[in-house]
A protein has these predicted regions:
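C-terminal subregions of glycosyltransferases and related glycan-biosynthesis enzymes
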Residues: 169, 174-179, 183-184, 201, ...
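Nucleotide-sugar donor-binding/catalytic module of glycosyltransferases
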Residues: 1-227, 231, 329
């Protein structure tokens, strides 16, 4: 057993598989660091999840349920959990409902917060129910600009300092398909004391049919034709139409718009001394296509993004130009002022 300062584990739950949920909560209770509270933010009716938690944890008082029955989606459900973090917390960990942590996960990551604002690690990729290990993550921290361009930080692998919450909350408002909590938190952390990804394996990253995203390192495959179908489906769901203008808006928000939203929101919330002019030239309201293209070329050369990503990013820029993208982001930034 290890002694450590008090912290909070934020777990986002939605209709969890009872067996996977049982294993995950058991792995939390087995942590060598024991002084923590687990805030379980329930998307939807909290009663069934509360009953399951009571049964699994045998009344362990470290688990607390939050939720009012409303459906927020994955992104804003994590925001609700973070809003419930105790002011006593000296560290925060994000948790999915269906993974399984190694017993020393928190203990191994916690010392890094003396030097950086957010630390992430690696995971074994395990298929369920076969329990077969199909691979391991190979996340790398390429620095703040490349983190904005292509997120390598997976929320369930992260531990961060509560100093980030004053800047990160409320989350920027965008489509739940576009916006991701871990990308936003990594961007915020980079503007504070920095980020770090270590090589330690700290958990099983469980893959099954009900995953919201699956292993992020395996996303983005498929043909251009499949990408077009996906963006049409997303436009219909989030923009209410498959019209050319709706598809243009969705394409813009998927790449350029989401990154502009993060940067412009960040710049409103941090001291002027921490505003990065390079970041703004590539991603912010004053972004320049030449600066973005230069960064994409470097990212391609270093293998940070594939050629298809660079192509789709440039297409997203064009879609923003024809759909009033900059103005739409300005409105979204204003809507999410703390």
């Amino acid at each position: 057993m290890s002694t450590s300062p008090f912290g909070t584990i934020v777990l986002a739950a939605y209709s969890p598989d009872p067996e996977l949920f049982r294993r995950q909560l058991a792995s939390l209770r087995a942590q060598s660091v024991e002084d923590w509270e687990c805030v379980i933010s329930v998307d939807g009716d909290p009663a069934p999840v509360a009953a399951l938690v009571e049964e699994i944890t045998e009344g362990d008082g470290r688990f607390r349920i939050v939720g009012d029955g409303s459906r927020l989606g994955f992104y804003l459900n994590f925001e609700r959990g973070l809003l419930a973090v105790s002011e006593r917390s000296t560290w925060i960990a994000l948790c999915d409902q269906d993974d399984r942590w190694d017993a020393d996960k928190i203990e191994r990551l916690l010392p890094h917060l003396d030097e950086v604002s957010l630390v992430s690690a690696q995971a074994r990729i395990v298929s369920y129910p076969s329990e077969k290990e199909t691979g391991r993550t190979a996340r790398q921290d390429h620095g703040p600009l490349f983190t904005l361009l292509s997120n390598e930080f997976t929320g369930s692998l992260c531990l961060f300092a509560p100093e980030l919450l004053a800047t990160a909350l409320p989350f920027p408002r965008a489509s739940t398909r576009v916006a991701t909590h871990d990308h936003w938190l990594a961007v915020v952390a980079a503007a504070h004391r920095g980020t770090r990804i270590v090589d330690d394996l700290v958990q099983d990253y469980v893959q099954h049919d009900a995953n919201v995203f699956g292993d992020p390192s395996r996303l983005g495959g498929g043909s251009i034709r499949q990408s077009v179908r996906n963006i049409r489906d997303q436009a219909e769901r989030y923009e209410g139409s498959r019209s050319p203008r709706a598809i243009a808006r969705m394409t813009f928000w998927t790449y350029v718009g989401w990154r502009q939203l993060m940067v412009d929101t960040l710049d409103r919330r941090i001291p002027e001394s921490r505003i990065d002019a390079r970041r703004d030239r590539v991603f912010g309201d004053g972004r320049r296509f030449r600066a973005a293209s230069a960064l994409l070329r470097v990212a391609r050369r270093r293998g940070i993004v594939p050629a298809r990503f660079a192509l789709e990013y440039r297409a997203s820029w064009l879609c923003g130009a024809i759909s009033g993208g900059r103005r739409a982001v300005r409105r979204a930034v204003a809507a999410a002022r703390p």
